């Protein structure tokens, strides 16, 4: 994610593992729990990750001081991320910072213990953030072919995490055809609970509407757009204003007149004949067969 050089975002890496932090590309790296773990990992124990974060509360507060918005991202199920993420998010929210969690759930083949840890961590993190976007790794298997290797699958998970963050921050930080400010984003993300993300890419004459259809039907959403009360949309690429209007109207028709839809659009001359659309849904009315995966 650091390599993508996302505009307006400062990265902070947090880990108990001293050796792992040496490979961290974030300009700021914080080792937590040195007294507790002696510079080693958390041993896949979330309680160790939690105590490690509590050991370095002042360092964590200093790292996020002055931020308007904090994203807490990690892969749930292990020790450090699962245990420390709710602590870090709680600090940010207590400081009055708009706090968004973007996390992955492990593949089911990683075992019951790791999945149970992830479920518990997600529940705790949900109480500590304004909005929580959960990306189930199992659903990524529907987006790749059978020949995809494990490293490639994990890279895909990282790409979705990156797109979730960038899809939000670019709306604020990059001037475009339709601009949003921080207050707009805050409206649809402050105290909203669980959210879902869909991403669509398309080319051709109908690229905008095609990308939107792919995004709103993405398996990552684990739900349908009908009944969503808040919808945040980022349309980026080689796109015209009429194409933006067509795609936005399609979403409005699906979500209904009562949905609060906020969207921004940026033109990228380097994205020749390609459009990428990120859709984030929150406060979804649950009805059969819609379900939330937690």
Describe the role of every protein-language-model region.
Residues 1-287, 291:
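Tubulin/FtsZ superfamily GTPase core signature
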Residues 294:
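Nucleotide/phosphate-binding catalytic cleft detector across ATP-hydrolyzing
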């Amino acid at each position: 994610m650091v390599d993508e050089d996302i505009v307006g975002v400062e990265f902070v890496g947090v880990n108990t593992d001293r050796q792992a932090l040496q490979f961290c590309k974030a300009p700021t790296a914080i080792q937590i729990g040195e007294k507790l773990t002696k510079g080693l990992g958390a041993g896949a124990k979330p309680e160790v990750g939690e105590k490690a974060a509590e050991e370095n509360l002042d360092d964590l507060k200093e790292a996020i001081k002055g931020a308007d918005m904090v994203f807490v991202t990690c892969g749930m199920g292990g020790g450090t991320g699962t245990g420390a993420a709710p602590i870090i998010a709680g600090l940010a929210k207590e400081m009055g910072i708009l706090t968004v969690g973007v996390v992955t759930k492990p593949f089911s083949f990683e075992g019951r213990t790791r999945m149970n840890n992830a479920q518990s961590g997600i529940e705790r993190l949900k109480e500590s953030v304004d909005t929580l976007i959960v990306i189930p790794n199992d659903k990524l298997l529907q987006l790749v072919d059978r020949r995809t290797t494990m490293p490639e699958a994990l890279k895909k998970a990282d790409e979705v995490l990156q797109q979730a963050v960038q899809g939000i921050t670019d709306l604020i930080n990059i001037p475009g055809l339709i601009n949003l400010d921080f207050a707009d984003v805050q409206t649809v993300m402050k105290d909203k609970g669980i959210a879902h993300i869909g991403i669509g890419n398309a080319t051709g004459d109908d690229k905008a509407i095609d990308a939107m259809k792919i995004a709103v039907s993405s398996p990552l959403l684990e739900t349908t757009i009908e009944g969503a009360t808040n919808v945040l949309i980022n349309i980026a690429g080689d796109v015209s204003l009429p194409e933006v209007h067509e795609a936005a109207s399609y979403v409005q028709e699906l979500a209904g007149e009562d949905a609060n839809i906020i969207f921004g659009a940026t033109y990228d001359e380097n994205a020749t004949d390609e459009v990428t659309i990120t859709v984030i849904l929150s406060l979804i009315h649950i009805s059969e067969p819609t379900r939330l995966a937690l």
